[in-house]
Amino acid sequence: MITCTLRYVIDPYRLAEFETYAKMWIPLVERFGGQHHGYFLPSEGANNIALALFSFPSLAAYEIYREQSRHDAACQAAFQYADETRCIVSYERSFMRPVFG
């Protein structure tokens, strides 16, 4: 299993728009075979950092999702929404592997 961790720098004045964006992506990742672990929005501390975590069985499965999402109308609508609302300033993507006890 591989877990994609996204760290977003968001516009804190557009938090509601970012939450809408997040809710768009959760079912999309799951439709493409991923397991979404949720978005984590600012509560205390920095008001412009948000996280998202989702997993795929392998990096190859993730790459298939990335390729298919480029051609999916709902995914493109989510990207367009983020562009139009400018709720995301920047983001970085990391891949992690879980360790269980």
Predicted regions and their residues:
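An amphipathic, aromatic/His-enriched active-site/gating alpha helix that lines ligand/cofactor pockets
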Residues: 20-37, 55-92
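Short beta-strand-to-loop capping motifs
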Residues: 7-12, 54-58
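Short, surface-exposed ligand-recognition loops at beta-strand->loop->(often short) alpha-helix junctions
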Residues: 10-20
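Short acidic/glycine-enriched loop/turn segments that link adjacent beta-strands
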Residues: 45-48
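Short, structured motif recognition centered on aromatic/hydrophobic residues
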Residues: 2-7, 18, 29, 50-53
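Long, low-complexity, Ser/Thr/Gly/Pro-rich intrinsically disordered segments that act as flexible linkers
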Residues: 92-101
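Residue-level signal for secondary-structure boundary sites
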Residues: 14-16, 60-62, 101
